[in-house]
Design a protein with these regions (language model features):
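Juxtacatalytic substrate-recognition/specificity segment
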Residues: 60-184, 188-192, 202-203
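Zymogen propeptides/activation segments of proteases
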Residues: 23-95, 99, 355-358, 383, ...
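Bacterial Sec-dependent N-terminal signal peptides
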Residues: 1-25
Length: 435
């Protein structure tokens, strides 16, 4: 009898243990796997007391969201921290994550068939902290991830998530072994802003300070460290011209010995002169945001770019420090004295003609914010003659500083901020004779 009772008790204990294991396993949903990073391999995700736990987790088809113990089980009821609101709208977060994921994967093509993201969910780690910095990247060079605190994700649009998830997708290229992505650099920040701008076309309004800052610094070289968060406009131009997937292709093609401009030229077999033509076309369009995706919504920003000029006896020169650098640009408004009149200007380069080249031309803008463009010019000493459209209300001269003959990125990869001990970026000085 005792032996029979012992067997029954062992059976019941085994059943309880088995059910407990099944209960723990049921916390992990079906579908894509949840990757456990190396740094957490010793942690017990089944234990609700652990820093990261299946008991404080939410999943979608493509994401797993973990949150720290301090939030409690329900993010909508998270206790304040030092008097600060720590609540998170989890439903909105999950919804936005999937919306952004679909664009970055299916339209922008940052991941290709065979990606590790087909096996694993991307990871979002919510820190119970007042630290305002958010990060996007990957775990163990396996799967894209991002780390964020509540104060960055309490708005409905979740611009921060759109930006940081952009970094997660950029990192996934390295995780999947499909490209080197130059080994890093400011292009990552510019691209995340471009990705954000695609999923939220009102980014330039919501975070208008970026546009305001760029309007003070657009003379600086392309991908200057001061502008990488402010100016995704060249990337918008490239995607308009080459297709939405071109930026991901650029990341895959970029080698550690290159910079993005060199990679782009290589991808499309462009000479420096041809690339300079494209950069002028891009910047002349930027006067009215003449890019199909945002043209209508951005008419309100038409004609806002302006370069400080010194004007003396009909000779205009950029104010000290404002001459364009390599693939930076200037914008100068030319007075219209009579509608439909013929405008005559003379351009004179004032830099070393063996090294400096220019692209320049005119942009006429009507009251509705529509633009008409003159032919672009590249002469070092050139005369401009242009008959104004009858409906033109404003006229802008646009000039781009370009390398001559050969493009050499300035500094350690053109897209990195320059160190204090490095020589300054070259300026492309010029004179504009206004008649």
């Amino acid at each position: 009898m005792k032996r029979a009772m012992r067997k029954i008790m062992l059976f019941m204990l085994s059943a309880i243990t088995y059910c407990g294991v099944m209960a723990q396993e049921s916390l992990v949903p079906e579908g894509k796997e949840i990757y456990i990073p190396n740094e957490f391999r010793e942690d017990d995700f089944n234990n609700p007391e652990s820093k990261w736990s299946y008991h404080r987790m939410a999943t979608t088809e493509n994401f797993v969201v973990f949150w720290e113990k301090g939030f409690g089980a329900d993010l909508s009821k998270a206790p304040d921290l030092e008097g600060r609101n720590m609540k998170v709208d989890l439903d909105n977060l999950l919804k936005r994550l999937e919306e952004f994921y679909a664009v970055y994967r299916d339209k922008m093509k940052f991941v290709l068939p065979g990606s590790k993201s087909e096996r694993y969910r991307m990871m979002v780690m919510l820190n119970y902290s007042l630290e305002g910095t958010a990060y996007g990247g990957s775990y163990d060079n396996v799967i894209g991830a991002l780390w964020v605190s509540p104060n960055r994700i309490q708005d409905k649009k979740l611009n921060c998530i759109a930006h940081e998830l952009g970094h997660s997708f950029q990192s996934q290229i390295s995780c999947d072994g499909t490209g080197q992505s130059w080994g890093g650099g400011g292009i990552f920040e510019m691209t995340s802003q471009w990705m954000l701008w695609n999923v939220n076309p009102e980014w330039t309004t919501d975070e208008n300070y970026h546009l305001q800052d760029f309007k003070k610094k657009f003379h600086l070289r392309f991908l200057h460290g001061s502008n990488i968060y402010h100016s995704p406009y060249v990337l918008e131009y490239w995607s308009m011209k080459r297709g939405l997937g071109v930026i991901a292709d650029l990341f895959r093609a970029g080698r550690r010995s290159e910079d993005p401009a060199s990679t782009y030229m290589k991808m499309f077999d462009l000479t420096v002169d041809q690339f300079s033509d494209e950069m002028y076309d891009c910047y002349s369009r930027l006067i009215t945001f003449d890019f199909p995706r945002v043209k209508e919504s951005h008419r309100k920003f038409a004609g806002e770019f302006s370069t400080p000029m010194d004007k003396e006896s009909g000779v205009w020169t950029p104010a000290e420090g404002f001459a364009p650098e390599i693939y930076g640009f200037n914008v100068v408004e030319i007075p219209i004295e009579k509608k439909g009149a013929k405008i005559k200007l003379q351009f004179k380069g004032d830099s070393d003609p063996e090294k400096a080249a220019f692209r320049y031309g005119l942009v006429a803008v009507n009251a509705a914010g529509d633009a008409e463009y003159s032919a672009s010019m590249s002469e070092y000493d050139g005369k401009i003659s242009y008959k104004l459209p009858k409906d033109a209300e404003r006229l802008f001269f646009v000039v781009v500083g370009c390398p001559k003959g050969e493009y050499k990125p300035y500094g350690r990869n053109m897209f990195r901020p320059r160190g204090e001990n490095q020589e300054p970026d070259p300026k492309f000085d010029y004179k504009l004779l206004v008649k």
